[in-house]
Amino acid sequence: MTNLEDKLSASIKTENKDTIAPASTPAKPAARSAAPETTKPASTGAKPATRTAAKKPVARATTTKPAVSKSSKPSADDIQVPAHDTSTHPRRVWPD
């Protein structure tokens, strides 16, 4: 069992050395620093590219309930009763 533990610890030590070695080397200068320094990043207050122009809201279905089918008989509030027209049959008034 100790032989297996020794191999495992040895492999861990070599992995640690591999990960530490590249980090200890000095960092190379960035590739874009070789570009001419006359080009400057845009410092204007332009809108970010991700923002889009204002759009009209998309029309969505406003009804969440299914349409209710009307019955053949209208309700009492919907019935239209014709007004009594007295012009064709005026009330008869008897003279005194």
From Swiss-Prot:
It comes from the Bacteria. Its main location: other. Residues 59-74 have a biased composition (Low complexity). The keyword Mitochondrion does not apply. GO terms for biological process: carbon fixation. Keywords: Bacterial microcompartment, Carbon dioxide fixation, Carboxysome. Residues 1-18 have a biased composition (Basic and acidic residues). Disruption phenotype: Carboxysomes (Cb) are no longer evenly distributed over the nucleoid region on the whole cell length; 66% localize to one cell pole, 5% have Cb at both poles while 29% lack Cbs. Cbs are nucleoid excluded. The keyword Translocase does not apply. One of its GO terms (cellular component) is carboxysome. It is found in: Carboxysome. Residues 1-96 are annotated as: Disordered. Signal peptide: none annotated. Monomer, associates with McdA:DNA. Interacts with shell components of the carboxysome. McdA and McdB together mediate carboxysome positioning on the nucleoid and to prevent their aggregation in the cell. Undergoes liquid-liquid phase separation at pH 7.0 in the presence of crowders polyethylene glycol or Ficoll. McdA is an ATPase that forms dynamic gradients on the nucleoid in response to adapter protein McdB, which associates with carboxysomes. The interplay between McdA gradients on the nucleoid and McdB-bound carboxysomes result in the equal spacing of Cbs along the cell length. Stimulates the ATPase activity of McdA, causing McdA to be released from DNA. Incorrect positioning (aggregation) of carboxysomes results in reduced CO(2) fixation by encapsulated form 1 ribulose-1,5-bisphosphate carboxylase (RuBisCO, cbbL/cbbS), which leads to slower growth. This is Maintenance of carboxysome distribution protein B. It comes from Halothiobacillus neapolitanus (strain ATCC 23641 / c2).
